[in-house]
């Protein structure tokens, strides 16, 4: 079962399409990072956002857009449910970078993410380590662009 990561403002919960319905709560604002927008039941009242990009894209601007979207929702004190197909690569990357920007170490981020989404812990133990330098570069670019806009 997936659990929310409580943040200074709002929370973020991760899932994939296979456990989306089991994870979705009425208070969630849904951020979909899949290629196709999900089909919603007429009774679904959740606020929804859709942004697709390839999981292994190295363009900081593309990841930065996803970070902006989620950060804006969290700053508004929303409870965000973020998902992609597996809830691992795009979802994991965005959440990893968000937590790193809160001054958590790699090991702390891995622990928090694995506790929140235990089904991906084995995958993340390797993937997050291999992608750490790339994610750190994206974070640096994101922060620099944020400073330029201020």
Where do the language-model regions lie?
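Cys-dependent protein tyrosine phosphatase-like superfamily
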Residues: 1-81, 86, 93-150
């Amino acid at each position: 079962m997936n659990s929310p990561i409580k943040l200074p403002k709002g929370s973020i919960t991760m899932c994939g399409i296979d456990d989306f319905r089991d994870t979705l709560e009425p208070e969630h604002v849904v951020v979909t990072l899949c290629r196709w927008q999900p089909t919603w039941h007429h009774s679904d009242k959740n606020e929804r956002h859709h942004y697709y990009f390839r999981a292994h894209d190295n363009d900081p601007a593309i990841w930065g857009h996803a970070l902006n979207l989620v950060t804006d929702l969290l700053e508004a004190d929303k409870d965000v449910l973020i998902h992609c197909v597996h809830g691992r690569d795009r979802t994991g990357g965005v959440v990893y970078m968000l937590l790193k920007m809160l001054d958590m170490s790699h090991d702390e981020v891995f622990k928090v993410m694995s506790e929140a989404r235990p089904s991906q812990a084995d995958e993340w133990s390797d993937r997050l380590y291999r992608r750490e330098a790339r994610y750190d570069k994206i974070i640096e670019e994101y922060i620099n662009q944020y400073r330029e806009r201020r």
